[in-house]
């Protein structure tokens, strides 16, 4: 019996090895950097809100058996184009964000469909294909926005375009600037729409999560006839969150250190709501027939075909949904930054999103919402804290920058090696 328990503990540790390792790295880096708890919490909330949707966009392709979708770069480009156009048309604020999202969605549907069709031609090689497709798309994007805008595509806007003089001495505008600043009303339009102090939000979150937990347990006991233990397990995500929030609420009342850490922390409510809605959309899709088809295709394409599922169509739909969600994620990301680096903002989107997902404990063939948020928190804490820790240790923040690059690509490499090892 003791040996069985020992094996079970080892199995759990092996399964959660990556998140545990990065949790330790985060704690050590925070300690070395000497940054205050309030700074770390504020920066983490900002970065989770900025990046979460991009990482959520990876879930459906993983479920569909296509691995980690590096081609979300195309969705990011679609979102960027929407933001560039609303800046050109001077549609500012939340209406501008909505218009940009609609434009991005349409473009992402087209690009996602083409990507899905390509993936159907290279089954089993989707990840490397998605990565190379991203590089190719970057080249096409640069060609359009450096040379074609203003010359082939009619557009004149001194605010966002480069100018030069022709032989006749006339000012002409060709190509976009490297950096396009959003108008004041568009910068942080979503984040600043509604903010609340964390100390006021915490009790409401606690009551909300507790209520949802009770409803799920009651539904499982009443409708599905499950016992209490199985019902609690079905609601484990909400239950664990409720317990954590409850402990935090107690500490807020009893610990001055915790009060100080959270005293100035603000939460962008609208951003959180949008992230929650996108997560609910993905979860809802997984509960529908389409979601069951996606899971079946991911497990075994031959079995799915025998069951009458249109495998190619299902894979295209999963790719389209991933690309569309990525376009929304890039819009949320860039409004938080306040500008768009026209030719650079999208380049590392896929790599950073994939790395964050893997840090959360996901793999090529399995990804959950819990892993999305665990990975987002851990990866981005390391992302902003390692340069500060490097500066303290070596008086050179550049070493921290090198570690960030090593961290990102190293995670992906190790994950692929472990996946191949398990298959042997």
Model region roles, listed by residue range:
Residues 91-138, 156:
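Alpha-helical transmembrane segments within multi-pass membrane transporters and channels
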Residues 26, 39-89, 109-127, 357-366, ...:
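Single transmembrane alpha-helix segments in multi-pass membrane proteins
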Residues 2-56, 92-95, 264:
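Membrane-interfacial amphipathic/re-entrant helices at transmembrane-helix boundaries
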Residues 48-59, 77, 106-110, 275-276, ...:
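Hydrophobic alpha-helical segments embedded in the membrane of multi-pass proteins
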Residues 68, 320-326, 330-405:
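Transmembrane alpha-helical segments in multi-pass inner-membrane proteins
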Residues 1-26, 216-225, 229, 233-237, ...:
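Cytosolic-side transmembrane-helix boundaries in multi-pass membrane proteins
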Residues 200-209, 214, 227, 234-256, ...:
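Helix-loop-helix "hairpin" substructures at the membrane interface of multi-pass membrane proteins
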Residues 138-196, 223-228, 237-260, 387-394:
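Extracellular/periplasmic helix-loop junction at the C-terminal end of a transmembrane helix
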């Amino acid at each position: 019996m003791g040996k069985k328990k020992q094996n079970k503990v080892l199995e759990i540790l092996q399964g959660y090895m990556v998140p545990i390792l990065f949790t330790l790295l985060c704690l050590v880096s925070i300690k070395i950097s000497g940054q205050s708890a309030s700074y770390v919490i504020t920066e983490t909330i900002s970065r989770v809100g900025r990046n979460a949707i991009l990482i959520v966009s990876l879930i459906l392709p993983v479920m569909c058996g296509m691995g980690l979708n590096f081609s979300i770069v195309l969705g990011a480009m679609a979102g960027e184009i929407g933001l560039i156009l609303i800046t050109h048309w001077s549609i500012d604020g939340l209406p501008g964000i909505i218009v940009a999202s609609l434009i991005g969605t349409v473009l992402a549907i087209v690009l996602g469909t083409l990507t899905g069709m390509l993936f159907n031609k290279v089954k089993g090689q989707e990840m490397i294909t998605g990565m190379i497709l991203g590089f190719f798309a970057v080249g096409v994007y640069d060609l359009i926005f450096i040379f074609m805008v203003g010359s082939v595509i009619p557009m004149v806007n001194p605010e966002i375009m480069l100018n030069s003089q022709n032989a006749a001495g006339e000012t002409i505008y060709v190509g976009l600037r490297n950096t396009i600043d959003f108008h004041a009303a568009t910068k942080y339009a979503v984040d600043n729409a509604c903010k609340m102090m964390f100390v006021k939000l915490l009790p409401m979150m606690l009551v909300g999560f507790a209520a949802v937990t009770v409803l799920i347990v009651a539904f499982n006991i009443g409708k599905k006839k499950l016992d209490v233990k199985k019902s609690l397990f079905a609601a484990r995500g909400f239950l664990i969150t409720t317990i954590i929030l409850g402990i935090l609420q107690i500490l807020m009342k009893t610990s001055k250190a915790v009060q100080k850490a959270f005293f100035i922390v603000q939460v962008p409510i609208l951003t959180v709501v949008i992230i929650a809605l996108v997560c609910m959309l993905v979860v809802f899709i997984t509960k529908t027939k389409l979601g069951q088809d996606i899971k079946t295709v991911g497990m075994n394409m031959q079995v799915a075909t025998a069951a009458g599922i249109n495998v190619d169509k299902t894979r295209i739909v999963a790719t389209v949904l991933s690309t569309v969600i990525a376009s929304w994620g890039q819009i949320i990301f860039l409004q938080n930054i306040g500008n768009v680096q026209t030719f650079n903002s999208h380049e590392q989107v896929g790599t950073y999103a994939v790395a964050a997902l893997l840090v959360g404990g996901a793999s090529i063939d399995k990804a959950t919402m819990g892993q999305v948020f665990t990975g987002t928190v851990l990866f981005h804490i390391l992302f902003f804290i390692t340069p500060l820790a490097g500066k303290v240790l070596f008086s050179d923040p550049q070493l921290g920058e090198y570690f960030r690059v090593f961290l990102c690509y190293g995670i992906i490499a190790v994950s692929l090696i472990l996946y191949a090892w398990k298959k042997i």
